[in-house]
Amino acid sequence: MINGGHRYMRELKKNEFDIVEQLFHDANVHLTFAFSVVEGKQPGRIFIDNNINPTCCLIVSNSGKHLVAGDAKNIIFNDFLLEYLSKHDNHNHYYDLYNSSNEWIEKIDEILSDNAVRLNRNLYQWDKSKLSSIINWSIMLPESYELRKLDEYLFEKYVNEMDSSYSQLWESASRFIQNGFGFCILKDGEFISICNTYYVKQGFAEIDIVTKKEYRSQGFATIVCSAFIKFCVEDGIMPLWDCDAGNESSKKLAEKLGFKCIDEYQMHWWHEDKNVISNYLKKFNIN
């Protein structure tokens, strides 16, 4: 019995997580965050309908991303999903809900009604033939700026000064160093641009890039991302880039760095502040 007494669902223990891989093994690679939870690299929870032969599951990353996979016609599971997502204690101020099939997209529309919006996303994978330009870009840093790989100190500094959500993505600085990596450009010890592993799974790393507003459009994002990609290549990791279909600046940077779009997919997004949703949809020209 879990979360308000739903007696037909079970939350898995961490050493049981791999039981759900069969439910989305053939799904697209954009489920990086889900594999990261299953593989124990990043924190999260997993719920199933049957611990002997599960037919569907909900994977919850501490970052706010969720995945539903398996049988979309399971009425008991769908009731649980609505119940779980309706409780504020089960998420922060928002959630992202991903799916393993087109059937799930329609079912989620039905379950959540008008409580979430459907977004179009683009997934990019890096083209290995672009390595020579990546290496050149990574050594073009202007004087007075420093390019560094993140260590525990820089990770904690980033969490405290730039993006506190990384404390949910990674349980500690040491866990980040153990399972993830990142690069940053500094000037006088202060962050200018940072490229991190947002999510990781075996052999893949999903990129997160942030550049301070006053330093944008000056090439810093290109340089720090190039260093990140070069490290991936040397370590046998495939870099991934995931963004909203309407985010033209992100798509432009991805293509400049040598990423190719390999998938267009849909997911659902909910935020407790409807103005946040409205402004977001306007910003990225989403109807």
What do these predicted ranges mean?
Residues 171-212:
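A conserved beta-strand-loop-helix scaffold within acyl/acetyltransferase catalytic domains
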Residues 103-116, 222, 245-263:
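Conserved active-site alpha-helix within GNAT-family acetyltransferase domains
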Residues 29-42, 161-182:
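Active-site rim helix/loop that mediates acceptor-substrate recognition in acyltransferases
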Residues 1-5, 44, 50-154:
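Acyl-donor-binding surface of acyltransferase catalytic domains
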Residues 43-60, 181-195:
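Conserved beta-hairpin
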Residues 4-30, 130-171, 281-287:
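Short amphipathic alpha-helix that is part of the acyltransferase structural core
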Residues 75-84, 217-231, 252-256:
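Conserved acetyl-CoA-binding loop-helix of GNAT-fold acetyltransferases
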Residues 117-129, 260-276, 284-285:
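Conserved catalytic-core motifs of GNAT/GCN5-like acyltransferases
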